[in-house]
């Protein structure tokens, strides 16, 4: 039998593009809702869920012994981080992206294919993100289907086609082309002298989340206990459960997780989000 351990690290809130959490409670983080539904489908599969931001430390802690990495992210900074990590540790990773009605997919295999960074300069159009143009569900379905086919091939020892797939579900266009010759010998990830520049431990404490009018902020010194005590002392109404605490401050909805991670809704400006956090906690 094939033993598969699945690690989930997803966005926090329910999204109408996602089928997986349709029966889960709205108050649950998406990653927990996904874990719950998947366990109901396959009780014999072990599924670990992490309500964390993917950064260098997360990958070093949880990604060292995986067989493949399946990309479901929505920004290129995280993909470049995954790309460096995957090539440093010789782990195949499967890229997938969606913009409006277009879909893109490619599987990167260290030692066999050029990496994500080698491919990027040839494809400037895929630098658009859902933050500015949005997506439609059929394009999401097409992307994930292509990714899952390659994942099944890798897990079962079958040959993966080393090509890049691009298409538009709206117009019906679909293209594939090989990218083996795109390797850059000077690439800092897969070239002759790799330095893996995106694998640094000094990550920013904030990030704007794609298409969500939200800024993520992290301060490890603010535990859930400290937060709840602060909210009680200042008579700020809040809701809390095992996973997160939700409250409002100056017309902004704020969601806090263990480990000092906060989502500040209602702004895309990190500077404004940081000011709000300083007003709250000094």
Language-model features: where?
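Adenine nucleotide-associated cytosolic modules
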Residues: 1-282
């Amino acid at each position: 039998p094939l033993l598969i351990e699945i690690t989930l690290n997803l966005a926090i809130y329910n999204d109408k593009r996602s089928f997986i959490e349709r029966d889960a409670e709205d108050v649950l983080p998406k990653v927990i809702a996904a874990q719950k539904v998947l366990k109901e489908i396959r009780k014999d599969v072990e599924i670990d869920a992490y309500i964390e931001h993917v950064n260098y430390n997360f990958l070093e802690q949880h990604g060292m012994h995986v067989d493949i990495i399946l990309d479901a992210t929505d920004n290129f900074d995280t993909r470049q981080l995954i790309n460096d990590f995957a090539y440093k540790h010789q782990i195949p990773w499967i890229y997938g992206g969606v913009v409006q009605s277009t879909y893109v997919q490619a599987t990167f295999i260290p030692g066999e294919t050029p990496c994500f960074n080698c491919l990027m300069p040839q494809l400037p159009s895929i630098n658009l993100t859902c933050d500015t143009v949005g997506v439609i569900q059929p394009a999401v379905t097409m992307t994930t289907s292509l990714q899952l086919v390659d994942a099944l091939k890798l897990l079962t020892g079958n040959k993966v086609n080393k090509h890049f797939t691009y298409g538009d579900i709206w117009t019906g266009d679909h293209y594939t082309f090989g990218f083996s010759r795109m390797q850059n010998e000077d690439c800092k990830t897969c070239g002759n002298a790799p330095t893996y520049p995106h694998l640094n431990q000094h990550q920013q404490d904030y990030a704007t989340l794609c298409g969500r009018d939200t800024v993520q902020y992290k301060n490890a010194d603010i535990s859930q206990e400290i937060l709840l005590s602060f909210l009680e002392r200042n008579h700020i109404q809040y809701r809390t459960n095992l996973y997160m605490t939700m409250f409002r401050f100056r017309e902004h909805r704020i969601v806090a997780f263990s480990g000092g991670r906060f989502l500040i809704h209602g702004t895309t400006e990190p500077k404004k989000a940081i000011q709000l956090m300083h007003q709250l906690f000094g």
